[in-house]
């Protein structure tokens, strides 16, 4: 069992140890490292759906990441931008996504899945 809690410490060259996302078949929530430097722990029990579409920002900016993955929870929507996001979607489908975070653009060439940006928007307040 790995005790490494820092996703940056993972090897960028291995598809199994991608610093953008991690998997664990025994998790009950996903740890979202957002670009606002906050970390959000969102429970799979509140997962509503995930949707992957082409990133609409590419129409105006050719350098924008080509894919957009929206992960919708009961009280929050996580937006992930990047390339090869189908691997992240497969982890969500199996409730195995442990964490997701953006990594520097310099890793793009060495990764099949690269997360360029992560944002969390709360859709309603919970009490």
Which positions does each model-derived feature cover?
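Short aromatic-glycine motifs in intrinsically disordered, low-complexity regions
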Residues: 26-41
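Generic beta-strand hydrophobic packing signal
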Residues: 30, 50, 118-120
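Phosphoinositide-dependent membrane-docking surfaces
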Residues: 42-58
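Helix-rich interaction surfaces within compact, conserved domain-sized segments
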Residues: 77-127
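Anionic N-terminal interaction surfaces
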Residues: 1-25
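Short, surface-exposed polybasic-and-hydrophobic patches located at secondary-structure transitions
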Residues: 57-87
């Amino acid at each position: 069992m790995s005790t490494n809690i820092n996703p940056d410490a993972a090897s960028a060259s291995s598809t199994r140890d991608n610093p953008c996302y991690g998997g664990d078949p025994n998790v009950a929530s996903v740890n979202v490292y957002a670009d606002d430097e906050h970390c959000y722990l969102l429970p799979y029990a509140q997962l509503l759906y995930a949707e992957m579409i082409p990133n609409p920002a590419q129409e105006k900016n050719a350098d924008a990441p080509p894919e957009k993955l929206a992960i919708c929870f009961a009280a929050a929507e996580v937006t992930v931008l990047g390339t090869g996001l189908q691997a992240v979607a497969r982890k969500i489908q199996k409730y195995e996504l442990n964490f997701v975070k953006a990594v520097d653009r310099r890793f793009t060439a060495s990764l099949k899945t690269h997360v360029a940006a992560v944002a969390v928007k709360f859709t309603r307040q919970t009490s």
